[in-house]
Each structure stands twice: as structure tokens, then as C-alpha cells.
Curated annotation (Swiss-Prot):
A proteolytic cleavage generates a new N-terminus that functions as a tethered ligand. Activating serine proteases include trypsin, mast cell tryptase, coagulation factors VII and Xa, myeloblastin/PRTN3 and membrane-type serine protease 1/ST14. Proposed subsequent cleavage by serine proteases is leading to receptor deactivation and include neutrophil elastase and cathepsin G. At least in part, implicated proteases are also shown to activate the receptor; the glycosylation status of the receptor is thought to contribute to the difference. This is Proteinase-activated receptor 2. Disulfide bonds join 148-226. It is a multi-pass membrane protein. The gene is F2rl1. Belongs to the G-protein coupled receptor 1 family. Synthetic PAR agonist peptides (APs) that mimic the first six amino acids of the newly formed N-terminus activate the native, uncleaved receptor nonenzymatically by binding directly to the corresponding second extracellular loop to mediate signaling.
Amino acid sequence: MRSLSLAWLLGGITLLAASASCNRTVNAPGPNSKGRSLIGRLDTPPPITGKGAPVEPGFSVDEFSASVLTGKLTTVFLPVIYIIVFVIGLPSNGMALWVFFFRTKKKHPAVIYMANLALADLLSVIWFPLKISYHLHGNDWTYGDALCKVLIGFFYGNMYCSILFMTCLSVQRYWVIVNPMGHSRKRANIAVGVSLAIWLLIFLVTIPLYVMRQTIYIPALNITTCHDVLPEEVLVGDMFSYFLSLAIGVFLFPALLTASAYVLMIKTLRSSAMDEHSEKKRRRAIRLIITVLSMYFICFAPSNVLLVVHYFLIKSQRQSHVYALYLVALCLSTLNSCIDPFVYYFVSKDFRDQARNALLCRSVRTVKRMQISLTSNKFSRKSSSYSSSSTSVKTSY
């Protein structure tokens, strides 16, 4: 549990540092700032060049939005956290995916869901260098609108993909506890089907992010933002309905299902009769369940709640001061990509063994030889003890 404790400590440090950065950022504009959280307004109609091609229109932002885009919160704090997540998340999820696909022979439903969860985390983390570069260059996107769409689509898509696979994993764990005699192959086939359905669902729900324009040029700051500034009519209309639907359908319902599964799991474990050795395992399982459930809500709940609040404020009051906090919460949600591999390590004994063998550069053939040797040694000890006991019985007669 030490690794999970370190992850919690990292999350706490993130929150404290982010709170200080948010306070400095919000207070920068002064008391007269209207604070319309990254709403872009078209300055003038785009001029026409001599060739008849319109020049890219420029958008203006208010003082609060300018302070967020130029402040240390987005240009220093966020890239530092994303660098940490990238450095830890890329190798750990890559190794986890390799263990699940190439080192684990028995593809149980839990292994299938964890492999898909590792894949979702990996697909999210591999795009972080672009996001880090964007923030380090003062929130100036230089890679084109198409690549910005891909970055945003993968970022949000894989976040909600992780939520759904964690929900499937929690429901599957509860089902194994209440129905341990089920057919494993049938369960594995169901898990594969559910996984494919989740990937298809995530692709469909992220299509709007690939269709709409994500880059906005701001002449006053001489930067081109990626998703951080959008036209007011888009924020009030399409994006409000879109993200509200995502928050309810792809976060709220799975969160309630996950919480229910874990609560029922804890009740079932506590009510079951066990010996002293099994009691220790049960307590460890309950602690792990509480840790995973807390991680689930701490990583994903703040960003989804603040996102809904942000769009509600924009729609009702045409202003919002919570976008800076939302950026912090969204950054906090990426810590899940660092924590998940350690959760695999504590949840699955098979993953622990295979990961340890992989780190020690032991091939599958070497591991088999070690297992055969260990089994033969145990058998020889039992045989020798049986023969010695038989000899002692004969001599006594």
C-alpha cells in the first residue's frame, strides 16, 4: 500500500499548489473584471485578402481569461504535473499492457478489463508531449486544428473510457464474489464484447470534438489556443448540452454503479465467515476497495462537477470564475493514469508475479522451468518424508 500512499500524497501536494496558483491567477485582473471564463468574442468580420481568401478571424477575451492564459497556473504548474504523469504513466502502463497481453496466459474478465484500462491510459498519456509543449509555450498551439482535435478527442475520450472500464472491473469483482462458480470462458467472452462496445461508444460520443473547430486565434495575446477559448454561442449552446450529457451518462451513472458494487462487495465480505488467515485477506481487500473507490471519485468527480457548473454559469449568467479550478481538477484526473498500474499490482497476484519476472528479465520459459523445479522439489520432499515415516513404522514393528 506504500505506492498508493505516495499517490495520495502527490494528489494532496497537487491540490495545495494548485490552490495557491488559482488564487494568484484569479486575483490578477482586479475587482472590475467580469471573469467570463475563456469566452471568445469575434472582434471584427474577417478581412478579405487580394486573392479573395478570408484571413483567420481574431477573437478577444476579457481580463480574467487573459490572466488564466498567461498566468503561472497554465504555463508552469499544469505542464509540470503533466510531465510527472507522462514520465510515470507511459512506462508503467506500457509494461502493464505488455504483461496483460504477452505474459498472462489465462485471460480472465478482470485481466481483459484491466488490459483495456491500461490501453486507455496509454492512449491518453502518449499525447501529453503536445499538451506539455502547448502550455510551456504560453498556451500557443502551433500544430494545426486537426491535431488539436485529435488531442482533445483522445484526452476526453480516454478519460471517460477509463471510467467505464473501472466500472466494469468493479461490477465484475462483485459478481465473482457472489457467484464464484460461473463459467470462466463465457465470462471472458462477455468481457471482450463489453470492451468492444465501450470503445465503440467512446468513439461515437467523441465525434463532436473531432468535428467542431478547436483552435482560436487571439491577436491581443498573439497566441492560438487549443480548446481553451471557444466562441460564446458554442459554449452556451452545443457544448453545454454535449458536456452535460457526458457528465450524466458517462460519469454519474457509472459512478453510482461503481459505488453500489463496492458497497455491496464490502457488505458481502464482512458477512462471510472466515478463519484467521482469510480474515487478514478480507481486511486487505476491504482497504484496497476503499482506496480504489476513493481514488475513483477524487480523480474524476471534481473535473466533471466543475465542468457542469462552469457551463451552467456561462449559460445562465454569461460569466464563470471556475474555469481555473476546472483546469486543476482536470489535471488531477490525469493522476489516475499513474495510479492504475499500482492498483493492478495490488489487485492481481498473477500481475505481481509476471511484472516481477519481467523486471528481472525472466522469460516465460525460464519461469516455467522455475515452477517445474519448485514443484518437483516439493514433491521430492513429500516423498522423502513419506518414505522416512514408512521406514520408521516398519522398524518399530
